A protein has these predicted regions:
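Bacterial N-terminal signal peptides that target proteins for export
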Residues: 2-9
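Bacterial N-terminal signal peptides
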Residues: 10-18
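Extracytoplasmic copper-binding redox domains, predominantly the cupredoxin/blue-copper superfamily
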Residues: 22-108
Length: 108
């Protein structure tokens, strides 16, 4: 049961390598204590964005953050870890799949 919740925190963001969209788009993901029957989750499990797009993580509930998972991001991308209980954002400039989790809840 605990491993099921871990999957809720491993989120992939897929960047399209060839974007025909000249305007950047934004996505917002809420950090939540509960969503439906799941606990300690992000409001969206997968988000598809283009290079240049920004994802905003909203600290709707307390006790959460966002951290890129080591080995789960494209080569050349710097590590990223937000502060707890704070809204944060990241602009994606390198195409690829980005895995991330909530640091205090990664082993649930």
């Amino acid at each position: 049961m605990k491993n099921k919740n871990l999957m809720g925190f491993i989120i992939s963001i897929t960047l399209l390598m060839f974007s025909t969209n000249s305007m950047a788009a934004d996505e917002t993901i809420e950090m939540l204590n509960k969503l439906g029957k799941e606990s300690m989750v992000y409001s969206k499990k997968v988000v598809r964005v283009d290079v240049g797009d920004t994802v905003f993580w909203k600290a709707t509930d307390k006790g959460h953050n966002v951290e890129f998972i080591k080995g789960g991001i494209p080569e050349g991308v710097n590590k990223f870890k937000s502060k707890y209980n704070k809204d944060t954002e990241y602009q994606f400039t390198v195409p690829g799949i980005y895995a991330y989790w909530c640091t205090p809840h990664k082993n649930m």
